[in-house]
A protein has these predicted regions:
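Thiamine diphosphate
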Residues: 1-135
C-alpha cells in the first residue's frame, strides 16, 4: 500500500483529528482557532464520517460560554464531544471547565494558544490563556 502524504497547517490537522474522534462538536469562532471549527463544519456538511461511521453533529453556539455549556450537556448525555477556542474565549469557558472536571467527565479541548488581551486586541501567540485555566482540571 502506498502512503498518501498531505501538507496542512495546525488548524487543519486538529480539525481532521477532532472530526474523526467525536460525535458532537460545539463551535464559536474566535481567532486563531476559527478555522478549526469552520473545517469541522465543512467536513460534516460533506457527510464525512468519524471513526465509528457517524457524521459528527456540529453546532455553532451564540458565545464561547454557550459552546462550553453545549459540550458539558453533550458529555453528560454520553457523546464524545469537543470544541475549539483561544484567548478570552477560553477564559469564558472556565466555569464550565470546573463543572466538567468535577463530574470526572473527560474531553479534549483544542486551544490555539494566544495572548490574553489586557488593554487592546492582541493576536500574538503565548500561553497566558492556557495558564489561566490550568487549575480547572
Amino acid at each position: 500500500m502506498r502512503e498518501r502524504w498531505i501538507t496542512v497547517d495546525g488548524n487543519e490537522a486538529v480539525a481532521r483529528v477532532a472530526h474523526r474522534t467525536n460525535e458532537v462538536i460545539a463551535i464559536y469562532p474566535i481567532t486563531p482557532s476559527s478555522a478549526m471549527g469552520e473545517l469541522a463544519d465543512e467536513y460534516s456538511t460533506q457527510g464525512r464520517q468519524n471513526l465509528w461511521g457517524v457524521v459528527p453533529t456540529v453546532v455553532e453556539m451564540q458565545s464561547e460560554g454557550g459552546a462550553a455549556g453545549a459540550v458539558h450537556g453533550a458529555l453528560q448525555a454520553g457523546s464524545l464531544t469537543t470544541t475549539f477556542t483561544s484567548s478570552q474565549g477560553l477564559l469564558l469557558m472556565i466555569p464550565n471547565l470546573y463543572k466538567i472536571a468535577g463530574e470526572l467527565t473527560p474531553f479534549c479541548l483544542h486551544v490555539a494558544a494566544r495572548t490574553v488581551a489586557t488593554h487592546a486586541l492582541s493576536i500574538f501567540g503565548d500561553h497566558s490563556d492556557v495558564m489561566a485555566c490550568r487549575q480547572t482540571g
